[in-house]
Amino acid sequence: MKRIRDLWVRTNLIKKIGIGVVIGLLLGILLPDVTAIGILGQLFVGALKAIAPLLVFALVVQAISHQRSGQQTNITLIIVLYLLGTFLAALVAVIANYLFPLTLTLNTPVNTELSPPQGIVQVFQTLLLKLVDNPINALATANYIGVLAWALIFGLALKSVPSDFKHLIKTAADVTSQIVVWIINVAPIGIMGLVFSTVSENGISILSDYALLILVLVGTMLFVALVVNPLLAFALTHQNPYPLVFRCLKDSGLTAFFTRSSAANIPVNLQLCEDLGLSQATYLVSIPLGAMINMGGAAITINVLTLAAVNTFGIQIDFLTALLLSVVAAISACGASGVTGGSLLLIPVACSLFGISSDLAMQVVGVGFIVGVIQDSCETALNSSTDVLFTAIAENAFWKQKKA
């Protein structure tokens, strides 16, 4: 028994989740009437739902309050590239939804009452009202728009407090993140319950929907990595970007794929920047910063799954509303750094724009965790490799401008 326990502890989370998916699939086929197994999935989603608002608030407050000013000139360009790249990735995901519309099978009645927005004006009205929600109520009701807004305000207000108090804020954020790590560590069991419920209630054919979802997610990320990002690089450097793109994907993206952590991949990226001959003063700032705010892969995940939920509930949206979703997804994605499955936990932020309740949004998050074995690896590979890519092309453009 001890040998089995030690083997389980040594096995990485990706393999554990894969095992959970397989076991849940087999149990759903062989023992579909043992509904108690599905409770494990409900408990897992419930725990995530409980901690997610506090997690978003703590991380954003900590990041804003510790933000440093007076960065170098090309750091500004890198930040612009990070934000622009994240927005473009979100926009590509919206276009992918129009080309390959997806629907999800969720455990909710067909006649579930929703309050879909009536165009861009109502979306803005809803957004503004959620911005000024009571901060305690925003946390209690999972109003993520209000949580983000108040976290930004608190973070700015705390920038001038003594360093000891800032350390306390960081400790609170670290504690919250650790709780999430504990919850994520039982993800294989929770996902087993989710897969069991899905298969036992809907049959084995439901897996074909997940296969299509994975194809759209991974295909969109590949398009951004191999088309959108190279176009940005060419626009700034007027040089063939693909040698640099492939170097970043090989030396940074490959390791990030397996670590599934932009933060864990920072040492790899720093070494790659040194090998590329980039300015140390630049990449020592831009690489850790990119691990926090350069989240194109996360924006893709948020948009693809949110729009799949929108399609599932038959909510009609115009392109301007979808464009606003891209902005919200880009901003929300910046809060996904440093947390396993962070992009999935921010899906309710986007879903709330369309009147989709937190309960239903967390079911979408559950679907995300089922496909997360592949999605999270590809997402991290895109995010982390792009940190080096944008740092390199920004420095190249900066020195070309100085020489001119």
UniProtKB/Swiss-Prot annotation:
GO BP: serine transport; threonine transport
Membrane topology according to the record: Multi-pass membrane protein
Transmembrane regions: 17-37, 44-64, 75-95, 138-158, 179-199, 212-232, 287-307, 319-339, 354-374
Record key words, sorted: Amino-acid transport, Cell membrane, Membrane, Symport, Transmembrane, Transmembrane helix, Transport
Positions of disulphide bridges: none
PANTHER family recorded: PROTON/GLUTAMATE-ASPARTATE SYMPORTER, PROTON_GLUTAMATE-ASPARTATE SYMPORTER
Function: Involved in the import of serine and threonine into the cell, with the concomitant import of sodium (symport system).
InterPro entries cross-referenced by the UniProt entry: Na-dicarboxylate_symporter (IPR001991), Na:dicarbo_symporter_sf (IPR036458), Ser_Thr_transp_SstT (IPR023025)
Compartment(s) of residence: Cell membrane
Protein known as: Serine/threonine transporter SstT
Molecular function GO labels: amino acid transmembrane transporter activity; symporter activity
GO cellular component terms, A-Z: plasma membrane
Family named by the database record: Belongs to the dicarboxylate/amino acid:cation symporter (DAACS) (TC 2.A.23) family.
Record's catalysed reaction(s): L-serine(in) + Na(+)(in) = L-serine(out) + Na(+)(out); L-threonine(in) + Na(+)(in) = L-threonine(out) + Na(+)(out)
Signal peptide from the UniProt entry: none
